[in-house]
Amino acid sequence: MTKTSLRYLILCLALFPLSARAQDGDVQSKQYDDGGVYEGTFKEGVQHGTGTYTLPNGYKYSGEWFEGEIKGEGVAHFPNGSVYEGNFSKGKPDGLGKITFADGGTYEGEWQAGAIMGQGIALYANGVRYEGSFRNAKHHGKGVMQSPGGYEYKGDWVDGVKQGIGTITYPDGAVYDGDIIDGTRSGTGTLTMPDGLTYVGLWKDGQIDGVGTLTQPNGDTYEGDLVAGQRHGTGRVTYANGDTYEGAFKDDRRDGQGTFTGTDGYIYTGSWVAGQIEGEGQVTYPDGSVYKGTFRNDLANGKGKITYPDGSTYDGQWVDGIIEGDGRATYPNGVVYEGSFKN
């Protein structure tokens, strides 16, 4: 062996321990084929410990590594401007962490394999706040969403859509509690308004629709069919003073066949049009008189017969609730008059 060869061997042996020590703890820089640059500690030739990895597309990770893998606590800057700080596994956010998006929105909570998954809190750029369960970055499970305007939803979610059972509080103080389908009130639910109005019953596409009970602030209560928020179909109203109406409704008014019963003994059964007594019907007055015939604008109008408590009768023409025109009257003493009447 020549002196030159010997000197070369001694030099290599002297340098080898230094190289090994650098790879197993000292900070080093290394550039990879994809253009990425790593600066940090190594173990047995791979990233291990702490280090920073930068890619040409703007991605940057600083934090813990384990046997060549991003694993542990760290901070990642993504090309789109988002920044994630938290736990990593297999190079992806996993465990607990917080991401701040380029638009200022944030999410802090649980992650799985790079996806927002589990429990967390999201603050969106538009001011909306959501706290609850997530699946693949979408609201899923149970959660509470609040908007800056005062709207709040608390309940079930499916793939980012309100679905299931929930409670909605509106900015004006109204509260809905019940079924939600595809983000709208559908199914069975209760609405309570600030002025005291309440509704319990069926909903469809966000509106009162179906069978339900509607109680007005003044105490009037309606039980029956409703369509698009209005009384429509068959139902019963119990008024605050004890009067009742049972029968047909159309466009939120008494329309069709129905019976009105007053606490004073007044009873009408017959036809209604646009909320008024109109058409054929029969009324029993508080004094016991009974009229049967035609009506218009809530009054006897046209042809009809009235029988009084003393047995006297009138059968003939009426105008606006007054006997007027041709008719026949019978009196208790047996007198009969047939002819024309006025007032």
Question: Across the structure, where does each feature detected by a protein language model lie?
Answer:
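Bacterial N-terminal signal peptides that target proteins for export
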Residues: 1-9
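Bacterial N-terminal signal peptides
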Residues: 8-17
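Sec/Tat signal peptide C-region and signal peptidase I cleavage site
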Residues: 18-22
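Conserved anchor residues at repeat-unit boundaries in beta-strand-based tandem repeats, strongest
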Residues: 37-48, 60-71, 83-93, 106-117, ...
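Short N-terminal segments immediately surrounding and downstream of signal-peptide cleavage
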Residues: 23-39
